[in-house]
Amino acid sequence: VCRDWFKETACRHAKSLGNCRTSQKYRANCAKTCELC
């Protein structure tokens, strides 16, 4: 679980879309975030 609620939400949202890498809105945090979640 991510410490940052926003990042955790972004991670879950990106995973739910099935494509973390191309999620432009969360692109900056997505790679690191998804590894933590």
Curated annotation (Swiss-Prot):
One of its GO terms (cellular component) is extracellular region. The keyword Secreted applies. The record marks Q24 as: Important for binding Kv1.1 and key residue for binding Kv1.3. It holds the Pfam family ShK. This is Kappa-actitoxin-Bgr1a. The record marks N19 as: Key residue for binding Kv1.1 and Kv1.3. Changing R3A: Small decrease in affinity on Kv1.1, Kv1.2 and Kv1.3. Disulfide bonds join C2-C37, C11-C30, C20-C34. The record marks Y26 as: Important for binding Kv1.1, Kv1.2 and key residue for binding Kv1.3. The record marks F6 as: Key residue for binding Kv1.2 and Kv1.3. Changing E8A: No change in affinity on Kv1.1. Small increase in affinity on Kv1.2. Small decrease in affinity on Kv1.3.
